[in-house]
Each structure stands twice: as C-alpha cells, then as structure tokens.
Design a protein with these regions (language model features):
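Class I SAM-dependent methyltransferase Rossmann-like catalytic core
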Residues: 1-25
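A short acidic, Gly/Pro-enriched loop at the edge of an enzyme's catalytic core
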Residues: 55-76, 80-83
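A short glycine-rich, Lys/Arg-flanked "PGG" loop and its adjoining helix->strand segment in the class I
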Residues: 77-94, 111
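Conserved class I S-adenosyl-L-methionine
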Residues: 23-37, 97-120
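A short, well-structured beta->alpha microelement
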Residues: 11, 15-16, 34, 39-62
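Short acidic, S/G/P-rich loop/turn micro-motifs used as interaction or catalytic elements
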Residues: 35-38, 69-76, 101-104
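Core SAM-dependent methyltransferase catalytic element
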Residues: 113, 117-147
Length: 147
C-alpha cells in the first residue's frame, strides 16, 4: 500500500504532464522534495527521458521541460531552485510549477519570480491538490519589431 504523500504525488503527475504538453520523446527534469518519486512515476508512464534534480547531469540546456513540485515549501526557497534550473533548460523550454493553493499576493510573487527569470506565463490552473502555472522561455516568443 502506498503512503498518502506518494499517492498525492501520483495525482499531480497527469495534470502536470497535460499542462506542459509533454511527449515521451522530450527530456524532462523534475525538481522538488519528491523529485525521485515523480521521476519514477514518469518512467512508469513511458517518459523514459525524465531525470530527477539529483541525477540530471551537468547543466547544458539539455531539458525541454521542467516539472517543479513545490507543495509544502516556501516561495523564498523556490528562488534558489529556479536559479539552479535555468542552465539546464533549453531556449524553448517549458516550466510547470505546482504549489499549494495560495493567497492572491503569493500567486503574484510566484508569477513575478518566474517572469524575472525570462519566462512568459502561459496558463495557470487550480486543482484539488494545489495550483500550477505553465510558463515558456521568452525566447520562444520573439519580440516583433514595429513596421
């Protein structure tokens, strides 16, 4: 029988995959306190190129997707993890950050933190296990010059 925390982790895998629009051919890095468990769950679902933060290699912009499970942790601690993740992500990478349900001010802080690192917020969602946002690197949205 699985523990409630792992079962909760299992419940966020499908929504995170759907939000990111992941394919089994993409390289995925998973961060957060349960990153190994989430990586193994992704492997069971056929995402064999998924790696946990602890075994993701050297940062060379090799990952297409970052899935960050940041439930039961502070947004301040997320800053350090986000800084660390940046060099692992390709110029067209997507980022999904899953957090506990938050007050509007905390959501704005999260959005500002993600935007500060060169991401454009594409979508946000609320789920029974918390809330998540999807962001893409701003290089994926080139600035159009005026005529």
């Amino acid at each position: 029988m699985s523990s409630p925390q792992i079962a909760t982790g299992d419940r966020i895998v499908d929504p995170m995959i759907a939000l990111a629009g992941c394919s089994t051919r993409q390289r995925i890095v998973v961060a957060g306190s349960k990153s190994m468990e989430l990586m193994l769950e992704l492997h069971r679902r056929g995402y064999l190129l998924a790696a946990a933060a602890g075994n993701c290699g050297r940062p060379t912009g090799q990952y297409d997707v970052a899935l960050v499970d940041w439930r039961r942790r502070t947004l301040h601690a997320l800053e350090t993890t986000m800084d660390w993740l940046m060099n692992f992500l390709s110029p067209h990478a997507v980022l999904v950050v899953w957090v506990d349900a938050q007050k509007p001010a905390a959501n704005e802080s999260l959005r500002a933190s993600v935007a500060k690192r060169g991401f454009v917020i594409v979508h946000g969602t609320v789920h029974e296990c918390g809330c998540a946002l999807l962001a893409r690197r701003s290089q994926a949205y080139p600035v159009q010059k005026a005529a």
